[in-house]
Amino acid sequence: MPISPALAERIATSPKAELHIHIEGSLEPELMFALAERNGVKLPYASVDEVRAAYAFNDLQSFLDLYYAGASVLLTEQDFYDMTAAYVARAVADNVRHAEIFFDPQTHTARDVPMHVVIGGIVRALDDAERAHGFSSRLILCFLRHLSEADAFDTLEAALPYIQDPANRIIGVGLDSSERGNPPEKFARVFARCKALGLRLVAHAGEEGPAQYVIDALDILQVERIDHGVRAIDDAALVKRLAASRVALTVCPLSNEKLKVYPDLRDHSLKQLLDAGCAVTLHSDDPAYFGGYMNTNWLATFNALGLSAADAHTLARNSFEASFLPEQDKALWLNAVDIHWRAHT
């Protein structure tokens, strides 16, 4: 049963934190085409409509193939600025007040786009967003798991000068790309090095991979947050562990439906995980490719699963509690969330 218009409005206007957003995955077809034209890049699509037609993927790999083709238009600092500024505009419109944004340097350095170009453009846009909108943000550098451990180490070393400068907003590392055949332990030594450097640790696990990958991300990589994690529902002991530890799951329902992790949003495990006491949070993943930014994901999920106002309050609180913000900042945002939801009860 669809939620009421009143609840939909409360959800849309609620403060939120977005913790699972790939900045390259926010590249809309219109901007992709504009950047291709600006940079003289030939795309394998004749029109914006052809790109949108290509969005009928069947699995994670077919999505990734399109994702990396789209990234080929990103060549200059201004390109990264424009992409990031476009994401921020969408996030601000959805009442996202804080975002911890993934970026994939290997996608760009492999194309001979220097690290300073990637980080420089993204950070400049985030600095402008903070000044213009009070938009709070941090960056999480993600390693591509289909590449080698050695490549990840090389990327970490190249990024260290940027990581060590707080002005660049990089607070942690993550692990993304193809799960199949690339278990967490492949990057155990890389994550140990990152932990020694004092970086926050997250990893994609339990999306297309099994519940065991969630366990391995926790035990071997020692992550503080699990990105996706929906296959945890297949292991009752793991669900109990996640609920007890309050290690957050950054769940992306429209992404899961689009990539056939679940055949239909009504089959999604989010409500089961939430009802079991897990620290579930709700995000957009790659919104340009999966058909929705934050509010679209929230509203679609609430309509499909019949979630309540109390669930919305919990999910909004969880998003800030699971963030890597300083405790005093978390407290301010949690208070804002409580005021918003209690005003409507």
Curated annotation (Swiss-Prot):
InterPro entries for the chain: A_deaminase_dom, ADE, Ado/ade_deaminase, Metal_Hydrolase
UniProt-recorded Gene Ontology molecular function terms: adenine deaminase activity; zinc ion binding
Site (Important for catalytic activity): 228
Catalytic activity: adenine + H2O + H(+) = hypoxanthine + NH4(+)
Residue ranges that the Swiss-Prot or TrEMBL entry lists as coiled coil: none
Residues reported in the UniProt entry to bind substrate: 286
Binding site for Zn(2+): 20, 22, 204, 285
Cofactors that this protein relies on: Zn(2+)
Family: Belongs to the metallo-dependent hydrolases superfamily. Adenosine and AMP deaminases family. Adenine deaminase type 2 subfamily.
Cellular component GO terms, alphabetical: cytosol
Domain of life: Bacteria
Described function: Catalyzes the hydrolytic deamination of adenine to hypoxanthine. Plays an important role in the purine salvage pathway and in nitrogen catabolism.
Designated name of the protein: Adenine deaminase
Keywords, alphabetical: Hydrolase, Metal-binding, Nucleotide metabolism, Zinc
Annotated catalytic residues: 207
Gene3D superfamilies: Metal-dependent hydrolases
Tagged with keyword Metal-binding: yes
Transmembrane segments: none
